[in-house]
Amino acid sequence: MGIRPTLQTNPLVDLLISTSQTQLQNAGLPFPPRSFGCLLVRHSPGCLPGSLWNLPRSRLPSCLPICLPRCRCWLNRERWRKGDDVFSDFCTKFVSTLIGPTSFAFRFVEFFYL
């Protein structure tokens, strides 16, 4: 998918990058058109927790952009939280398929329409 991480790689990032179209389809998840994507938001000073829509664009290079199927939801260590827009079984299934229920290297994850 031509992804170049901007942060030091870790097992979660490696898992997301190595997830292919076939793997997603085998998991019952549709692969997105190129016009869709998401950002993994790292919980760090350069990538503040909160809404990406309020994050200054100049701060985005310190985050980690990854191309993933479309959906919008929030994930944190303790529980799923309903976001302002779409929260669906698709989001839950997609994130739990890729990351698993207990393995979080990133505290906040948001999937959204580009």
Swiss-Prot record:
Where does the entry say this protein is expressed, by tissue? Expressed by the venom gland.
The record's principal subcellular location, in a coarse class, is secreted
- What are the protein's UniProt keywords? Disulfide bond, Neurotoxin, Secreted, Signal, Toxin
Highest taxon, organism lineage: Eukaryota
Q: Name one GO cellular component term.
A: extracellular region
What kind of modification does the protein receive after translation?
Answer: Contains 3 disulfide bonds.
Name where it's found: Secreted
Drop me one GO molecular function for this one. toxin activity
Indicate whether Secreted appears among the record's keywords. yes
Q: Give the UniProt family note.
A: Belongs to the scolopendra neurotoxin 8 family.
Q: What is this protein called?
A: Putative neurotoxin 7
Q: Which organism is it from?
A: Scolopendra mutilans (Chinese red-headed centipede)
Its taxonomic path starts at: Eukaryota, Metazoa, Ecdysozoa, Arthropoda, Myriapoda
